Amino acid sequence: MTGRPTLVAIDDELEFTKAIEQFFTTRGYQVHIALTGPSGLKLVEAHRPDAVLVDLKLPGMDGDELLQRLRRTHPQTPVIVITAYNDGGKTRDRLLALGAFAHFDKPLSSLRDLADTVKRALGKPAEQKK
């Protein structure tokens, strides 16, 4: 990977995607955001990101279908799922079995934990706790 790492964030909550964009941009990432599954797929095709952040509940295509398509078309690209849907771990287990790199519940308790997971996905060391 050369230059700035690139992320695509796909979530139907504009405020959430803008917060993700701002957080990662200030840390040297290039971030592209999409509010629907189909537009997210187009961004992945156009930008070939280093990692994808995706919600499960999306207009046009749910996160499960999106994850499965990404695994077929971009098997080396880590996909991190961030969702408000929490069922005691069943969803997490299913997503990991489908090939997700990691799973986070909304609301996120720490953007730093997400950043550390993205760095792990990209093969970089995580930030040191202060």
Residue positions per predicted region:
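Hydrophobic/aromatic residues positioned on beta-strands within the core alpha/beta folds
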Residues: I82-T83
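Alpha4 helix (beta4-alpha4-beta5 surface) of REC/receiver domains from two-component response regulators
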Residues: E65, N86-D116
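Acidic catalytic/metal-coordinating carboxylates
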Residues: T36-S39, D62-E65
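Conserved acidic segment of CheY-like receiver
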Residues: R4-E15, I20-F24
